[in-house]
């Protein structure tokens, strides 16, 4: 457990059951959106620092603001097992604050959210309660997010992206970097119109 003013905890040091976590990471991937029975949107995001990667579960509007390449500070988060995998949560009163973009040393390996036999005992003890808490009391996971102007006057977040492409990252280290238009979800297709200078209406005249 570390406090808000303590140095950030490395991902490699995160264990199930830890609370009040202060972690700084870069967002690598945004998972697809799933919906709970009571209508809340949940995204599982792959994040990393120089010691490895982990999955963080982000709820509702905040998840829609996060983009790959964002450098984020999590405060007052907690770690728990979910379906056999170590997962970070914002927690009640937790906060996600964007502090930069792109420039951070990170390593995708090891992935600490991969199933780990050492955590099976803790999973069996806490999985049922964790699932119940996730579905019944989403306030534990919602938290807050800061994606507006920073203290130094630099605009961050969706409102600062304008018409520029946002960073889409490399999903597996082998693929190309795919530009993504701001405000589009990962599961949406961005249509691009290519014009040859002719009026397209003329082609349909009989």
Swiss-Prot record:
Coiled coil: none annotated. Residues 114-146, 166-206 are annotated as: Disordered. GO terms for molecular function: DNA binding. GO terms for cellular component: SOSS complex. GO terms for biological process: double-strand break repair via homologous recombination; mitotic G2/M transition checkpoint; response to ionizing radiation. Pfam families: Ssb-like_OB. Its main location: nucleus. It is found in: Nucleus. Residues 181-196 have a biased composition (Polar residues). Residues 26-89 bind DNA. Keywords: DNA damage, DNA repair, DNA-binding, Nucleus. Component of the SOSS complex, composed of SOSS-B (SOSS-B1/NABP2 or SOSS-B2/NABP1), SOSS-A/INTS3 and SOSS-C/INIP. SOSS complexes containing SOSS-B1/NABP2 are more abundant than complexes containing SOSS-B2/NABP1. Component of the SOSS complex, a multiprotein complex that functions downstream of the MRN complex to promote DNA repair and G2/M checkpoint. In the SOSS complex, acts as a sensor of single-stranded DNA that binds to single-stranded DNA, in particular to polypyrimidines. The SOSS complex associates with DNA lesions and influences diverse endpoints in the cellular DNA damage response including cell-cycle checkpoint activation, recombinational repair and maintenance of genomic stability. Belongs to the SOSS-B family. SOSS-B2 subfamily. This is SOSS complex subunit B2. The gene is NABP1.
């Amino acid at each position: 457990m570390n406090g808000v003013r303590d140095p950030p905890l490395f991902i490699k040091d995160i264990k199930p059951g830890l609370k009040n976590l202060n972690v700084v990471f870069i967002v690598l991937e945004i998972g697809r959106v799933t919906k709970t029975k009571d209508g809340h949107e949940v995204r599982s995001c792959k994040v990393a620092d120089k010691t490895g990667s982990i999955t963080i579960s982000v709820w509702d509007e905040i998840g829609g603001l996060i983009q790959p390449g964002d450098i984020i500070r999590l405060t007052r988060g907690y770690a728990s097992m979910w379906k056999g995998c170590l997962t970070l949560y914002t927690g009640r009163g937790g906060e996600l604050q964007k502090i930069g973009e792109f420039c951070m040393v990170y390593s995708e390996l090891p992935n600490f959210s991969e199933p780990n036999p050492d955590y099976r005992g803790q999973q069996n003890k806490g999985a049922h309660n964790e699932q119940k808490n996730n579905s019944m009391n989403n306030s534990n996971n919602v938290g807050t997010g800061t994606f507006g102007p920073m203290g130094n006057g630099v605009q961050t977040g969706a409102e600062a992206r304008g018409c520029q492409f946002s960073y889409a990252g490399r999903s597996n280290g082998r693929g190309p970097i795919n530009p993504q238009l701001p405000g589009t979800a990962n599961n949406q297709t961005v249509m691009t119109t290519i014009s040859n200078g002719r009026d397209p209406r003329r082609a349909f005249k009989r």
